[in-house]
Amino acid sequence: MSVLTSLPEWKNLSDIAASVKSAHMRDWFAQDTSRADKMQLEACGIFLDYSKNRVNEDALKGLFDLARACKLETLRDAMFSGEQINSTEGRAVLHTALRNFSDRKVLVDGEDVMPEVHATLEKIEAFTASIHSGEHKGYTGKPIKHIVAIGIGGSFLGPKIMTEALKPHTVDAVKVHFVANVDGCHIHDVLSSIDFEETLVVMSSKSFSTQETLQNTLTAKDWFLKSGGTQEDIAKHFVAVSSNVKAATDFGISADNIFPMWDWVGGRYSLWSAIGLPISLALGFENFKGLLEGAFEMDNHFTTAPLEENMPVLLGLLGIWYRNFFDAQSHVLLPYYHYLRGLPAYVQQLDMESNGKEVTQEGESVDYPTGPIIWGSEGTNGQHSFHQLIHQGSGVIPADFMLPLNVPNQDDTHHAMLASNCFGQTQALMQGKSFEECYADLDGKGLDDAERKRLAAHKTMPGNKPSNTFLFDSLTPQTLGALVAMYEHKVFVQGVIWNLNSFDQWGVELGKVLGNQVLAGIQGEADKDNFDASTQQLIAKFRAANAPK
């Protein structure tokens, strides 16, 4: 038995869960008309209704007791103070420093990092202004109109999804094209549609050697040179976000156009850094800064609000409740706003890369479930497909619904219909429809009793399906920044409870190593005996299909 599962607070929650499982939320709402009023929170422009969760006062108290027993507050403060909480890599975890608008120093190995953070923001601001004003021109004197942002993982998802979500704030001066996958179809589609004389490539890779990112950048360089540019002209058309200055300058990028990255910022937390340069180029620096300001506001809420009134803490503990005491294997995100459709993919990486672990900080195997599968899609599309599983499937799938109360450029009818579907889904999941109600609906349909009962069983909706609902006045940069930071801190809370290192990703690293080894095999540069029989067979088929004809 692990330290966690032997805690009295854990055992207490097991007992409470056994009792709660026999209760139905619709009865709780009937018995307590103030339930919705009591189970709501508001922070940083985000309203949270968590009343449609399978928790009562005993469960909530038990969860907060567990958080304190796991020293959540102490570990939270350790992260913000720059302690090396990424124990396997010996690193501080300080993405929060990138959005620190206070006068507080942030020390890494005794050095205050804030001057460099501020200098980088100023550099992003100045570079953005030079592109938007037309001051920075291509080598033929034409202004830059297209940005090709090349990255992968956190250096791709964060900028792309933030830019999509804030599309109403897009500037007219440039168009940003995001490229990640090493599948050549994407980079070739992008490059074939733009003028090389009006294009700036932003290459984002801490090492300047990430396989997919480097290959796509080399392809862009080859396209640029074949189109008429020279090696000397690259300095006006390529910039880098990287800590490997030598590799970037050897490539042809001007040292003035290299933006820094730091070891104390993980990839999935990097949109707040110079990795966010494409966001600034797409939306303007003030809107990029607005993202940081919203995240900073959520940081302050997370570090100062009592646990019982702390939105990320509450969300993290609800996740623990369902994953560990209700065997919920996944969690679904349902943004009812088209521009926010990419958020599930962003949180998927954030959560699953952080807490997809099976050993504790001490290297011991866990004896409890950890990170859930994160998935989702925009509403109302999902209602016509996978919502069926959420409503009538055999497992528990907690859901996060989110909706802006006001949206740009829409008539009232569209948005009212969107909102009604969002709220209606949360009610249907909670309330369900009983067998008796379904049986009564079939009265007068010309069915015998056996057939009525059979059909009623199929139509029955059990309800008691948990959900959170997030509302915000409109999706501003500040609100989006707060929303993303909220999920970051939720993931941190769950990692603390599970005693995981949420800030490494050795599974990802292994994939990179093996990918390079297999590439050598495909290119005939590695002994086939280095690979298992199955992989040998796959390599052989690929080589045969691509052999010179």
Swiss-Prot record:
InterPro entries (UniProt xref): G6P_Isomerase (IPR001672), G6P_Isomerase_C (IPR023096), Phosphoglucose_isomerase_CS (IPR018189), SIS_dom_sf (IPR046348), SIS_PGI_1 (IPR035476), SIS_PGI_2 (IPR035482)
Predominant cellular place of this UniProt entry's protein: cytoplasm
Pathway: Carbohydrate biosynthesis; gluconeogenesis; Carbohydrate degradation; glycolysis; D-glyceraldehyde 3-phosphate and glycerone phosphate from D-glucose: step 2/4
Example GO BP: glycolytic process
Cystines in this chain: none
EC number, as in UniProt: 5.3.1.9
Signal peptide bounds: none
Residues at the active site: E353, H384, K512
Entry similarity comment: Belongs to the GPI family.
Enzyme class, spelled out: isomerase
Protein location: Cytoplasm
Annotated SUPFAM superfamilies: SIS domain (SSF53697)
Alphabetic keyword roster: Cytoplasm, Gluconeogenesis, Glycolysis, Isomerase
Function description: Catalyzes the reversible isomerization of glucose-6-phosphate to fructose-6-phosphate.
Reaction(s) the record says it catalyses: alpha-D-glucose 6-phosphate = beta-D-fructose 6-phosphate
Protein name stated in the entry: Glucose-6-phosphate isomerase
Pfam families, alphabetized: PGI
Gene: pgi
An example Gene Ontology molecular-function term: carbohydrate derivative binding
